[in-house]
Amino acid sequence: MWNTILFAVIPYLAVAIAVLGGIWRYRTDRFSYSSQSSQFLESRALFWGSVSWHYGILMILGAHVVALVLWNQWASLVSNPTRLYTLEVIGLALSLVAFLGLALLIARRLIVRRVAAVTTPMDLVLLIALATQVALGIWIALGYRWGSEWYVHTAVPWLHSLVKLNPKPEYMVSLPAIVKLHAVGGFLLIALF
């Protein structure tokens, strides 16, 4: 039952909340899609944190999407141990860069008084949720090696089943709890946006 809730109900619920909430926000408060600009209040930490965060996370998300869309090619790519090791090291490095950038952005929001003055509780909730998700990804990369390979045989078929509106939570059942939490956390982030 829990597997059905976590891997069949929550994903659809998260997407529904994101779509309906997005429409509602657009109609009621169009400026709620981003936090207030704080660039003029402090720009040095913003630059280093923002660049690190965006470059790191966009590359990591790109790899997740490429493996999801081109799963056969991805499986072939990581079947070679040298390429697998290389991708794993690059992925871990990028996730650390993203995490450090996000940590800098969070610290900036909390420490710089002028920036803290325009920080909303939702800004902090979102930043902490993002940091948690990246930290879980780092934990998985360090503790459950070769995610580039097993992702394509577990999470990808599960995500494909969701897209086909025929959820198959059994693909996720055998995965470690931390991986399950990372997968559910991804959908909770979708709901937050």
Set out the residue ranges of the language-model regions.
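Membrane-embedded alpha-helical bundles of multi-pass integral membrane proteins
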Residues: P11-V15, G21-G22, S37-F193
